[in-house]
Amino acid sequence: MADVVVGIQWGDEGKGKIVDRIAKDYDFVVRYQGGHNAGHTIVHKGVKHSLHLMPSGVLYPKCKNIISSAVVVSIKDLCEEISAFEDLENRLFISDRAHVILPYHAKKDAFKEKSQNIGTTKKGIGPCYEDKMARSGIRMGDLLDDTILEEKLNAHFKAIEPFKEAYDLGEDYEKDLREYFKQYTPKIRPFIKDTTSMLIEANQKGAKILLEGAQGTLLDIDLGTYPFVTSSNTTSASACVSTGLNPKAINEVIGITKAYSTRVGNGPFPSEDATPMGDHLRTKGAEFGTTTKRPRRCGWLDLVALKYACALNGCTQLALMKLDVLDGIDAIKVCVAYERKGERLEAFPSDLKDCVPVYQTFKGWEKSVGVRKLDDLEPNAREYIRFIEKEVGVKIRLISTSPEREDTIFL
């Protein structure tokens, strides 16, 4: 059976810590979408690890880690991550169906961002997915055969010829790209496998599989705050599509949310706090992007968005992250509805324009940092947790009270 870990906000919820905390109980940990525009931050034995493509199970020697077919892969960045770990043989596998991000994709991304101003990381994620949908992309499996790779490269050079100047590719682009593959392909080849068959067989044999998403539900290309979204499907449903596991294989869906809200880049954010309180949350929560180092926009927990995300994903349990960031705040707000042009909205709309948050205020608490038992939390903190559970309709089974792996309350 497989369990899914999915972010139910705008990403950066703390999925890495949760996966790292529970990965030891699984045979496989699988990253099922996105690219190196997302980052997993894990603190292990006092050392901070920032992972962008590698599944969070790499810190456990007995865990097999898979990058599945819906992930788009920068082979340069993946090679750099691989070099930071030892003994990855037979522990890391990359789907032969996953698509390769080319340097061209990053150039195109930067060019388009000038006019669209979506707030992308300009890592080439979107353009790579564009080529995938246009059926013109290069897949990891193509790297296993030099003849096929050469054919794919020639087709790529022909297709981009009209855009070389616009995307500032340079006169030596063809030569440079061939050198690029020559440098990184030998390092990547040993890890490329038919991971779809591997996972189907593992599931049939009763292996325990953990499916790890990137970004968050509200950034989903179809169901998120379009056009300010990522280029992939971020909900739990995409875990099946990417891995080849059928929906019957899914057991638990663990939704990850912070005790407050954050967002990186542009786009609507009804519960954003533009006062010094937002700055306080950012500073105390160390809310800066793992990948870009950009400061995250911060605000109060949005239960309208949270209920929507839980319904989309079929969450069976929740993990509440960074409760300790709210320590010492006298009055804590929670968005319980929106108001738009005199109308109260309790369902998440497709367009958040003109939506104003309706808040309910709770008394704060002094300290929760480092607490590992529910009974040791102050009454006001427990009341806050119970309110979230009641409103969302999903039990909170895990509460994080610091970045350290051990500072976790299990319920």
Swiss-Prot record:
One of its GO terms (biological process) is 'de novo' AMP biosynthetic process. The active site is at residues 12, 40. GO terms for molecular function: adenylosuccinate synthase activity; GTP binding; magnesium ion binding. Its EC number is 6.3.4.4. Substrate binds at residues 290-296. It catalyses: IMP + L-aspartate + GTP = N(6)-(1,2-dicarboxyethyl)-AMP + GDP + phosphate + 2 H(+). Mg(2+) binds at residues 12, 39. It is an enzyme of class 6 (ligase). Binds 1 Mg(2+) ion per subunit. GTP binds at residues 11-17, 39-41, 296, 322-324, 400-402. The keyword Nucleotide-binding applies. One of its GO terms (cellular component) is cytoplasm. Keywords: Cytoplasm, GTP-binding, Ligase, Magnesium, Metal-binding, Nucleotide-binding, Purine biosynthesis. IMP binds at residues 12-15, 37-40, 121, 135, 215, 230, 294. It is found in: Cytoplasm. Homodimer. Plays an important role in the de novo pathway of purine nucleotide biosynthesis. Catalyzes the first committed step in the biosynthesis of AMP from IMP. Belongs to the adenylosuccinate synthetase family. This is Adenylosuccinate synthetase.
